Amino acid sequence: MRQENDSLGIVMVPEDKLFGAQTGRSKNFFSYGKELMPIEVIQALVKIKKCAAKANGDLQCLDAKRRDMIVAASDEILSGGLEEHFPLKVWQTGSGTQSNMNVNEVIANLAIKRHGGELGSKNPVHPNDHVNKSQSSNDVFPTAMHIAAVQSIKGSLIPALEHLQKNLDAKALEFSRDIKIGRTHLMDAVPMTLGQEFSGYSHQLRSCLERIGFSLTHLYELAIGGTAVGTGLNVPEGFVDKVIYYLRQETGEPFIPASNYFAALSNHDALVQAHGSLAVLACSLIKIATDLSFLGSGPRCGLGEIFFPENEPGSSIMPGKINPTQSEALQMVCSQVIGNNQSVIFSGTKGNFELNVMKPVIIYDFLQSVNLLSGAMRSFADYFVSGLKVNRGQLQQNVERSLMLVTALAPVLGYDKCSKIALKAFHENLSLKEACVSLGFLSEQEFDTHVVPGLMLGKRERE
């Protein structure tokens, strides 16, 4: 163990760790739970420190030597392998101050170590005076939240969503000539194609992509420069423009200064809105996964209109059983995301006066939702959707037996006569044709002329 100091006194920390006194205190006082601060947030914080050092150096608020030491230490952390030095849990101060200081301490000590100094000496690099210069946890942490959210959405969620949507598009084309019976209220309706059904799924996800893309607009606004309460106290002239410039270079994202720092520190409406778009996506995915599970139910005593890929045995007692496991896993992920949405919404209400104090749990839930959805959508696309096959025999049988084909006769016979045909066929176990002819409404030839499932698919499908 080695001795570290902060404003409250001495704290003993492990000799081989780069963090300091404030991280040590947080480890002691918030030791419960297993939920570590997400690495995406740590990386975002490190990027902010790197860019702030460059900005402070440009403004001659930080000497070139210390600037270069901080930048080099930041780059070393970003290259990976030092995750053990960031041990803090999500459950800490609601401003994220302790994780901000964790990053400050590790950067300072790493810079000191690389130049032959003594860990914990704060010389020549001080975690507050140099690494945290021109910053406050209150503007740094929400900035890190937005950076982590944007990069996770664009880096993993959107590509995974596009991948699934393209797989559904491919199936819509593959199944474009497979006529089936539509269902409303879980009951038989008029004919459509399986491809039309899949095109609906694809479009639903395309709309989700648009919503998520729109939510990025507000996430591009960064709180950096607001410092403690939004007034920008202790921020040198020109710092905000320079740090934003360097962050844009570092991340490749079009970040801009927040339009109002008081709002940027005290609320997280942008993240609440963005997570809301994830909850909408979860709703859409549950609908799609549920539909596909039902369409393939059976295979002999259910709907059985599609065949699932045979990925693994489905039962420990029933041999030969194949279950829609990818569908079920996706629905569990979506359930978690919808639960996270409630947490994010409530946490978003806790912007008491000038500072929201639920920041860590907001970004933890947000990133968990993004990571779970990204993985689950890729798995669902690759191991389920891409392997779906149509059971054409079952589709044809269902179409031939459907009573709702009588809808094609409504313009010819009227609603009331068509109702009599359908009810007679149902109660007497007749075909629609048999019921129609026995009632004397049409001849067999006339019936066949008007009731053609392939002509009931909508103008675009007929063309």
From Swiss-Prot:
GO molecular function terms attached to this record: fumarate hydratase activity
EC no. given is: 4.2.1.2
- Where the protein is mainly located, per its record? cytoplasm
In terms of SUPFAM superfamilies, this protein maps to: L-aspartase-like (SSF48557)
**Name of the top EC class for this enzyme:** lyase
Q: Which residues form a coiled coil?
A: none
Query: Which reaction is the catalytic activity of this chain?
Result: (S)-malate = fumarate + H2O
> Where is it localised?
Cytoplasm
State the Pfam families in the record: FumaraseC_C (PF10415), Lyase_1 (PF00206)
Cellular component GO terms held in the UniProt record: cytoplasm
Q: What residues does substrate bind to?
A: 95-97, 126-129, 136-138, 184, 316, 321-323
For this protein, the record's NCBIfam families field holds: fumC_II
**Name of the protein in question:** Fumarate hydratase class II
Q: Which organism is it from?
A: Chlamydia muridarum (strain MoPn / Nigg)
Taxonomic lineage: Bacteria, Pseudomonadati, Chlamydiota, Chlamydiia, Chlamydiales
Gene this chain is encoded by: fumC
